[in-house]
Design a protein with these regions (language model features):
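Helix-to-beta-strand junctions that scaffold the AdoMet/dcAdoMet cofactor pocket
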Residues: 295-302
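Conserved beta-strand signature within the Rossmann-like core of class I S-adenosyl-L-methionine
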Residues: 302-311
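Class I S-adenosyl-L-methionine
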Residues: 1-263, 267-292, 313-443
Protein backbone atom coordinates (compact mmCIF):
# COMPACT_ATOMS: atom_id res chain seq x y z
CA UNK A 1 0.00 0.00 0.00
CA UNK A 2 1.32 3.43 -0.89
CA UNK A 3 2.19 5.61 2.11
CA UNK A 4 -0.32 8.23 3.14
CA UNK A 5 1.22 11.60 2.38
CA UNK A 6 0.17 14.86 3.94
CA UNK A 7 1.37 17.97 2.11
CA UNK A 8 3.49 20.60 3.77
CA UNK A 9 1.35 23.08 5.76
CA UNK A 10 -0.38 25.69 3.60
CA UNK A 11 0.95 28.53 5.71
CA UNK A 12 4.40 27.50 4.49
CA UNK A 13 5.88 27.19 7.97
CA UNK A 14 7.36 24.23 9.81
CA UNK A 15 6.74 26.01 13.13
CA UNK A 16 3.81 24.39 14.92
CA UNK A 17 4.09 26.67 17.95
CA UNK A 18 6.19 29.60 19.12
CA UNK A 19 6.07 31.50 22.40
CA UNK A 20 5.51 35.24 22.53
CA UNK A 21 9.09 35.85 23.64
CA UNK A 22 10.39 33.55 20.86
CA UNK A 23 12.36 31.40 23.28
CA UNK A 24 10.32 28.26 22.62
CA UNK A 25 9.35 26.53 19.38
CA UNK A 26 7.74 23.30 18.27
CA UNK A 27 9.19 22.51 14.85
CA UNK A 28 8.29 19.71 12.46
CA UNK A 29 11.60 18.35 11.17
CA UNK A 30 10.52 16.82 7.82
CA UNK A 31 8.51 19.95 7.00
CA UNK A 32 11.49 22.16 7.84
CA UNK A 33 13.61 20.27 5.30
CA UNK A 34 10.88 20.28 2.65
CA UNK A 35 10.25 24.00 2.98
CA UNK A 36 13.98 24.76 2.90
CA UNK A 37 13.95 23.60 -0.72
CA UNK A 38 12.22 26.90 -1.56
CA UNK A 39 13.59 30.43 -1.25
CA UNK A 40 12.54 32.83 1.48
CA UNK A 41 10.25 30.51 3.43
CA UNK A 42 9.53 33.05 6.15
CA UNK A 43 9.31 36.14 3.98
CA UNK A 44 5.81 35.48 2.71
CA UNK A 45 6.94 36.27 -0.83
CA UNK A 46 4.02 35.64 -3.15
CA UNK A 47 6.15 34.84 -6.17
CA UNK A 48 7.94 31.83 -4.70
CA UNK A 49 7.84 29.11 -7.33
CA UNK A 50 5.28 26.29 -6.86
CA UNK A 51 5.24 26.51 -3.08
CA UNK A 52 1.71 25.09 -2.96
CA UNK A 53 3.14 21.94 -4.53
CA UNK A 54 6.01 21.49 -2.09
CA UNK A 55 7.18 17.87 -2.13
CA UNK A 56 7.25 15.83 1.06
CA UNK A 57 10.43 14.13 2.23
CA UNK A 58 10.15 10.53 3.34
CA UNK A 59 10.66 10.02 7.03
CA UNK A 60 10.48 7.40 9.77
CA UNK A 61 7.56 6.82 12.13
CA UNK A 62 7.65 9.22 15.08
CA UNK A 63 8.73 7.95 18.48
CA UNK A 64 5.72 7.00 20.57
CA UNK A 65 7.20 6.11 23.95
CA UNK A 66 10.32 7.33 25.81
CA UNK A 67 13.23 5.03 26.62
CA UNK A 68 16.11 5.01 29.07
CA UNK A 69 19.80 4.60 28.32
CA UNK A 70 20.97 5.00 31.92
CA UNK A 71 23.68 2.72 33.36
CA UNK A 72 22.30 -0.34 35.12
CA UNK A 73 23.07 -0.44 38.81
CA UNK A 74 24.52 1.98 41.35
CA UNK A 75 28.16 1.03 40.67
CA UNK A 76 27.84 1.58 36.94
CA UNK A 77 26.14 4.92 37.51
CA UNK A 78 28.87 6.01 39.92
CA UNK A 79 31.59 5.13 37.39
CA UNK A 80 29.88 7.25 34.76
CA UNK A 81 29.47 10.19 37.16
CA UNK A 82 33.14 10.03 38.15
CA UNK A 83 34.16 10.22 34.48
CA UNK A 84 32.25 13.47 33.87
CA UNK A 85 34.04 16.74 34.80
CA UNK A 86 32.29 18.79 37.47
CA UNK A 87 31.95 21.76 35.10
CA UNK A 88 30.13 19.52 32.64
CA UNK A 89 27.77 18.25 35.34
CA UNK A 90 26.99 21.86 36.29
CA UNK A 91 26.34 22.79 32.65
CA UNK A 92 23.99 19.83 32.21
CA UNK A 93 22.18 20.83 35.38
CA UNK A 94 21.62 24.34 34.00
CA UNK A 95 20.35 22.99 30.69
CA UNK A 96 18.07 20.46 32.40
CA UNK A 97 16.55 23.16 34.62
CA UNK A 98 15.93 25.45 31.66
CA UNK A 99 14.45 22.63 29.58
CA UNK A 100 12.12 21.51 32.38
CA UNK A 101 10.81 25.04 32.91
CA UNK A 102 10.35 25.54 29.19
CA UNK A 103 8.56 22.22 28.69
CA UNK A 104 6.25 23.08 31.58
CA UNK A 105 5.41 26.36 29.85
CA UNK A 106 4.81 24.47 26.62
CA UNK A 107 2.36 22.03 28.20
CA UNK A 108 0.46 24.98 29.66
CA UNK A 109 0.20 26.98 26.44
CA UNK A 110 0.24 24.44 23.61
CA UNK A 111 -2.40 21.84 22.87
CA UNK A 112 -1.77 20.08 19.60
CA UNK A 113 0.34 17.61 17.68
CA UNK A 114 4.10 17.72 18.17
CA UNK A 115 4.70 16.61 14.60
CA UNK A 116 2.77 16.47 11.37
CA UNK A 117 1.73 13.14 9.82
CA UNK A 118 4.76 11.65 8.10
CA UNK A 119 5.27 10.05 4.73
CA UNK A 120 6.90 6.71 5.53
CA UNK A 121 8.26 4.65 2.66
CA UNK A 122 8.69 1.09 4.01
CA UNK A 123 10.81 -0.07 1.07
CA UNK A 124 13.29 2.79 1.36
CA UNK A 125 16.43 1.53 3.08
CA UNK A 126 19.38 3.59 4.24
CA UNK A 127 22.57 2.52 2.57
CA UNK A 128 24.60 -0.29 4.16
CA UNK A 129 28.24 0.07 5.15
CA UNK A 130 29.50 -1.58 1.97
CA UNK A 131 27.89 -2.06 -1.39
CA UNK A 132 28.12 -5.51 -2.85
CA UNK A 133 28.93 -6.03 -6.49
CA UNK A 134 25.98 -6.66 -8.78
CA UNK A 135 26.88 -9.30 -11.34
CA UNK A 136 25.18 -9.96 -14.62
CA UNK A 137 23.69 -7.46 -17.01
CA UNK A 138 22.97 -3.81 -16.33
CA UNK A 139 19.30 -4.37 -15.47
CA UNK A 140 18.59 -3.20 -11.94
CA UNK A 141 15.62 -4.47 -9.96
CA UNK A 142 13.14 -2.29 -8.10
CA UNK A 143 14.36 -3.76 -4.83
CA UNK A 144 17.87 -2.53 -5.56
CA UNK A 145 16.59 0.90 -6.58
CA UNK A 146 14.87 1.32 -3.21
CA UNK A 147 18.22 1.32 -1.40
CA UNK A 148 19.82 4.69 -0.72
CA UNK A 149 22.66 5.04 -3.26
CA UNK A 150 26.32 5.03 -2.40
CA UNK A 151 27.46 8.63 -2.82
CA UNK A 152 31.13 8.04 -2.10
CA UNK A 153 33.67 9.97 -4.14
CA UNK A 154 37.37 9.39 -4.66
CA UNK A 155 40.04 11.23 -2.69
CA UNK A 156 39.71 14.95 -3.24
CA UNK A 157 42.30 16.83 -5.27
CA UNK A 158 41.69 20.56 -4.87
CA UNK A 159 42.01 22.68 -7.99
CA UNK A 160 42.54 26.39 -7.53
CA UNK A 161 40.29 28.74 -9.52
CA UNK A 162 38.16 25.93 -10.94
CA UNK A 163 35.21 27.50 -12.79
CA UNK A 164 31.73 26.81 -11.40
CA UNK A 165 29.30 24.48 -13.12
CA UNK A 166 26.09 26.41 -13.79
CA UNK A 167 23.13 24.07 -14.19
CA UNK A 168 20.66 24.45 -17.01
CA UNK A 169 16.92 24.47 -16.29
CA UNK A 170 15.46 20.97 -16.23
CA UNK A 171 17.61 17.83 -16.33
CA UNK A 172 21.42 17.93 -16.30
CA UNK A 173 23.27 14.70 -17.17
CA UNK A 174 26.51 13.76 -15.37
CA UNK A 175 28.80 10.75 -15.95
CA UNK A 176 29.33 10.37 -12.19
CA UNK A 177 29.70 12.29 -8.96
CA UNK A 178 33.48 12.33 -9.28
CA UNK A 179 33.08 14.64 -12.27
CA UNK A 180 31.83 17.45 -10.02
CA UNK A 181 33.77 16.95 -6.80
CA UNK A 182 35.35 20.19 -5.48
CA UNK A 183 33.47 22.16 -8.16
CA UNK A 184 30.94 24.81 -7.17
CA UNK A 185 27.69 23.63 -8.76
CA UNK A 186 25.14 26.44 -9.10
CA UNK A 187 21.44 26.54 -9.86
CA UNK A 188 20.83 30.21 -10.63
CA UNK A 189 17.22 29.62 -11.63
CA UNK A 190 14.13 30.37 -9.52
CA UNK A 191 13.04 26.78 -10.22
CA UNK A 192 14.59 23.51 -9.08
CA UNK A 193 17.04 21.72 -11.39
CA UNK A 194 17.67 17.99 -11.70
CA UNK A 195 21.02 16.19 -11.70
CA UNK A 196 20.86 12.82 -13.42
CA UNK A 197 23.97 10.88 -12.45
CA UNK A 198 25.26 7.53 -13.64
CA UNK A 199 25.62 5.24 -10.62
CA UNK A 200 27.67 2.02 -10.71
CA UNK A 201 27.11 -0.98 -8.47
CA UNK A 202 30.64 -1.69 -7.29
CA UNK A 203 32.52 -1.29 -4.05
CA UNK A 204 34.95 1.35 -5.30
CA UNK A 205 34.86 4.33 -7.63
CA UNK A 206 38.48 3.55 -8.60
CA UNK A 207 37.43 0.02 -9.52
CA UNK A 208 34.72 1.46 -11.78
CA UNK A 209 37.30 3.51 -13.66
CA UNK A 210 39.70 0.57 -14.02
CA UNK A 211 37.09 -1.78 -15.40
CA UNK A 212 35.76 0.89 -17.77
CA UNK A 213 39.27 1.24 -19.21
CA UNK A 214 39.45 -2.54 -19.60
CA UNK A 215 36.34 -2.38 -21.76
CA UNK A 216 34.04 -4.22 -19.37
CA UNK A 217 30.39 -3.27 -19.12
CA UNK A 218 29.55 -2.36 -15.57
CA UNK A 219 25.99 -2.57 -14.25
CA UNK A 220 24.57 0.83 -13.50
CA UNK A 221 21.47 2.96 -13.48
CA UNK A 222 20.97 6.68 -13.13
CA UNK A 223 20.21 8.48 -9.89
CA UNK A 224 18.35 11.78 -9.80
CA UNK A 225 19.06 14.59 -7.35
CA UNK A 226 17.01 17.74 -6.86
CA UNK A 227 18.91 21.03 -6.69
CA UNK A 228 16.76 23.77 -5.13
CA UNK A 229 16.37 27.23 -6.65
CA UNK A 230 19.40 29.51 -6.28
CA UNK A 231 21.33 26.82 -4.40
CA UNK A 232 25.08 26.24 -4.75
CA UNK A 233 26.92 23.18 -3.49
CA UNK A 234 30.44 21.79 -3.36
CA UNK A 235 30.72 18.00 -3.14
CA UNK A 236 34.03 17.47 -1.38
CA UNK A 237 35.87 15.73 1.42
CA UNK A 238 36.63 18.56 3.82
CA UNK A 239 40.30 18.39 4.84
CA UNK A 240 40.58 17.16 8.42
CA UNK A 241 44.01 15.54 8.33
CA UNK A 242 47.02 17.75 9.17
CA UNK A 243 48.68 17.20 5.79
CA UNK A 244 45.54 18.39 3.96
CA UNK A 245 44.66 21.46 6.05
CA UNK A 246 46.90 23.83 4.00
CA UNK A 247 44.53 23.23 1.07
CA UNK A 248 41.68 24.91 2.96
CA UNK A 249 41.94 28.41 1.39
CA UNK A 250 40.90 27.21 -2.06
CA UNK A 251 37.86 25.17 -1.01
CA UNK A 252 35.37 27.98 -1.28
CA UNK A 253 36.87 29.74 -4.28
CA UNK A 254 38.08 33.31 -4.28
CA UNK A 255 37.29 34.20 -0.68
CA UNK A 256 33.50 33.86 -0.76
CA UNK A 257 32.03 35.72 2.24
CA UNK A 258 28.90 34.67 4.13
CA UNK A 259 26.59 36.42 6.60
CA UNK A 260 25.70 33.13 8.30
CA UNK A 261 27.68 29.89 8.56
CA UNK A 262 26.13 26.73 9.99
CA UNK A 263 28.31 23.72 10.82
CA UNK A 264 27.40 20.19 11.88
CA UNK A 265 30.84 18.62 12.40
CA UNK A 266 31.30 14.83 12.53
CA UNK A 267 32.59 14.90 16.10
CA UNK A 268 34.79 11.97 17.17
CA UNK A 269 32.55 9.52 18.97
CA UNK A 270 32.91 5.82 19.69
CA UNK A 271 29.32 4.92 18.89
CA UNK A 272 29.44 6.88 15.63
CA UNK A 273 32.70 5.17 14.64
CA UNK A 274 30.87 1.86 14.93
CA UNK A 275 28.01 3.17 12.79
CA UNK A 276 27.66 2.66 9.05
CA UNK A 277 26.31 6.15 8.47
CA UNK A 278 29.42 8.30 8.28
CA UNK A 279 33.06 8.47 9.26
CA UNK A 280 34.31 10.90 11.85
CA UNK A 281 37.35 13.11 11.90
CA UNK A 282 40.52 11.86 13.59
CA UNK A 283 40.86 14.36 16.47
CA UNK A 284 39.20 17.38 18.03
CA UNK A 285 42.36 19.43 17.38
CA UNK A 286 42.28 18.79 13.63
CA UNK A 287 38.60 19.61 13.54
CA UNK A 288 39.11 22.86 15.44
CA UNK A 289 41.77 23.92 12.95
CA UNK A 290 39.30 23.33 10.12
CA UNK A 291 36.44 25.20 11.81
CA UNK A 292 38.63 28.19 12.65
CA UNK A 293 40.00 28.30 9.11
CA UNK A 294 36.51 28.43 7.60
CA UNK A 295 35.29 31.10 10.02
CA UNK A 296 38.35 33.29 9.60
CA UNK A 297 38.28 33.15 5.80
CA UNK A 298 34.58 32.99 4.98
CA UNK A 299 32.52 34.72 7.68
CA UNK A 300 31.62 38.35 7.05
CA UNK A 301 33.68 40.59 9.37
CA UNK A 302 31.88 42.49 12.14
CA UNK A 303 28.32 41.32 11.41
CA UNK A 304 28.60 37.63 10.49
CA UNK A 305 26.97 34.94 12.64
CA UNK A 306 28.30 31.40 13.05
CA UNK A 307 26.48 28.39 14.53
CA UNK A 308 27.98 25.01 15.44
CA UNK A 309 26.05 21.89 16.43
CA UNK A 310 27.55 19.98 19.36
CA UNK A 311 27.02 16.60 20.92
CA UNK A 312 26.56 16.03 24.64
CA UNK A 313 30.29 15.53 24.97
CA UNK A 314 32.33 18.08 26.85
CA UNK A 315 35.08 17.92 24.21
CA UNK A 316 32.78 18.76 21.31
CA UNK A 317 31.27 21.68 23.21
CA UNK A 318 34.64 23.09 24.28
CA UNK A 319 36.02 22.66 20.75
CA UNK A 320 33.04 24.51 19.29
CA UNK A 321 33.37 27.36 21.78
CA UNK A 322 37.12 27.64 21.29
CA UNK A 323 36.67 27.63 17.51
CA UNK A 324 34.29 30.57 17.79
CA UNK A 325 36.41 32.47 20.31
CA UNK A 326 39.68 31.87 18.44
CA UNK A 327 37.99 33.32 15.35
CA UNK A 328 37.20 36.54 17.21
CA UNK A 329 33.58 35.66 17.95
CA UNK A 330 31.63 35.66 21.20
CA UNK A 331 28.98 33.12 22.16
CA UNK A 332 25.65 34.96 22.44
CA UNK A 333 22.98 32.25 22.09
CA UNK A 334 22.39 28.53 22.57
CA UNK A 335 19.56 26.77 20.75
CA UNK A 336 18.60 23.51 22.44
CA UNK A 337 16.90 20.90 20.29
CA UNK A 338 14.83 18.78 22.71
CA UNK A 339 13.93 15.41 21.20
CA UNK A 340 10.44 14.28 22.17
CA UNK A 341 7.90 11.62 21.36
CA UNK A 342 4.87 12.46 19.28
CA UNK A 343 3.12 13.35 22.56
CA UNK A 344 5.75 15.89 23.59
CA UNK A 345 7.54 13.75 26.18
CA UNK A 346 11.38 13.82 26.08
CA UNK A 347 12.61 10.57 24.51
CA UNK A 348 14.91 9.89 27.48
CA UNK A 349 15.49 11.39 30.95
CA UNK A 350 16.48 15.07 30.79
CA UNK A 351 19.05 14.51 33.55
CA UNK A 352 20.40 11.34 31.98
CA UNK A 353 24.06 10.61 32.67
CA UNK A 354 24.77 8.40 29.69
CA UNK A 355 22.73 10.19 27.06
CA UNK A 356 20.64 13.36 27.07
CA UNK A 357 17.51 13.96 24.94
CA UNK A 358 18.85 17.17 23.47
CA UNK A 359 21.56 18.65 21.27
CA UNK A 360 22.89 22.18 21.58
CA UNK A 361 23.63 24.64 18.78
CA UNK A 362 26.16 27.27 19.88
CA UNK A 363 25.98 30.65 18.12
CA UNK A 364 28.68 33.30 17.98
CA UNK A 365 29.19 36.78 16.56
CA UNK A 366 31.62 39.66 16.91
CA UNK A 367 31.40 41.36 20.32
CA UNK A 368 30.13 44.93 20.44
CA UNK A 369 32.81 47.63 20.72
CA UNK A 370 30.85 49.21 23.58
CA UNK A 371 30.57 45.98 25.52
CA UNK A 372 32.54 46.03 28.79
CA UNK A 373 31.68 42.61 30.16
CA UNK A 374 30.71 39.19 28.90
CA UNK A 375 27.02 39.15 27.93
CA UNK A 376 24.47 36.68 29.20
CA UNK A 377 23.96 33.83 26.74
CA UNK A 378 20.35 33.67 25.58
CA UNK A 379 18.86 30.20 25.36
CA UNK A 380 16.02 29.03 23.14
CA UNK A 381 14.36 25.61 23.01
CA UNK A 382 13.34 23.90 19.78
CA UNK A 383 11.07 20.93 20.46
CA UNK A 384 11.12 18.41 17.62
CA UNK A 385 10.24 14.74 17.18
CA UNK A 386 13.40 13.00 15.86
CA UNK A 387 13.55 11.92 12.25
CA UNK A 388 15.87 9.35 10.68
CA UNK A 389 19.51 9.09 11.78
CA UNK A 390 21.61 12.23 11.22
CA UNK A 391 18.67 14.51 10.33
CA UNK A 392 18.38 17.64 12.44
CA UNK A 393 15.77 20.40 12.37
CA UNK A 394 16.42 22.60 9.36
CA UNK A 395 17.01 26.07 10.77
CA UNK A 396 16.53 28.26 7.71
CA UNK A 397 13.14 29.55 8.82
CA UNK A 398 14.31 30.36 12.36
CA UNK A 399 17.59 31.91 11.18
CA UNK A 400 15.74 34.23 8.81
CA UNK A 401 13.19 35.11 11.47
CA UNK A 402 15.78 36.04 14.11
CA UNK A 403 18.72 37.48 12.21
CA UNK A 404 17.61 38.78 8.81
CA UNK A 405 14.76 41.26 8.62
CA UNK A 406 12.60 41.78 5.55
CA UNK A 407 14.93 44.42 4.11
CA UNK A 408 17.98 42.17 4.37
CA UNK A 409 16.30 38.84 3.62
CA UNK A 410 16.71 39.19 -0.13
CA UNK A 411 20.47 39.48 -0.09
CA UNK A 412 21.96 37.58 2.84
CA UNK A 413 24.47 34.81 2.09
CA UNK A 414 24.52 31.56 4.05
CA UNK A 415 26.76 28.49 4.05
CA UNK A 416 26.16 25.07 5.60
CA UNK A 417 29.31 23.02 6.22
CA UNK A 418 29.10 19.21 6.52
CA UNK A 419 25.61 19.49 5.00
CA UNK A 420 23.49 16.44 4.24
CA UNK A 421 20.96 18.26 2.09
CA UNK A 422 20.79 21.35 -0.09
CA UNK A 423 19.00 24.59 0.79
CA UNK A 424 17.42 27.11 -1.56
CA UNK A 425 19.50 30.27 -1.73
CA UNK A 426 22.34 28.83 0.40
CA UNK A 427 25.75 27.38 -0.28
CA UNK A 428 26.31 23.85 1.05
CA UNK A 429 29.42 21.68 1.17
CA UNK A 430 30.56 18.27 2.36
CA UNK A 431 30.87 14.70 1.14
CA UNK A 432 27.18 13.95 1.88
CA UNK A 433 25.85 17.24 0.59
CA UNK A 434 23.48 15.54 -1.90
CA UNK A 435 22.29 12.78 0.40
CA UNK A 436 18.75 13.88 1.23
CA UNK A 437 18.25 15.52 -2.16
CA UNK A 438 18.32 12.10 -3.79
CA UNK A 439 15.00 11.71 -5.59
CA UNK A 440 14.28 8.46 -3.74
CA UNK A 441 13.87 10.38 -0.49
CA UNK A 442 10.99 12.46 -1.89
CA UNK A 443 7.32 11.64 -2.35
Amino acid sequence: MAPEIRPTPRNHSAILYQSNCQNLYVLDIPASISLAQHPRVSSGAAHVDNLEETSTIFSCPPSEIPYSTEPKGAKAMLRVMESIPSCELEYRKQIATFVRETMCELRTNFVGEYCLPRAVQPRLLQRPRKRGRVDGDATVTNAQCSIEPDLSITATCFEADAPPLVLAPGVNMLPGLNSIQTVAVKNNSISAAILQVKNYYTTSADENLLEERMGKTMPFHTERFRVPPQATFVLTHLPTEPNHLPELPIIFFNGKIFDFILMDPPWPNRSVRRSAHYQTTPTFNHLQTLLCGILERNLRPEVGIAAIWTTNNVNSRSTARESLENSGLQVFEEWIWVKTTSKGVPVSPICGLWRQPYEVLILGRKPSNTQDEKPTVRRRVIVGVPDIHSRKPHLKELVEQHFFNADYLEGYKALEVFARNLTAGWWSCGDEVLRFNWDGWWA
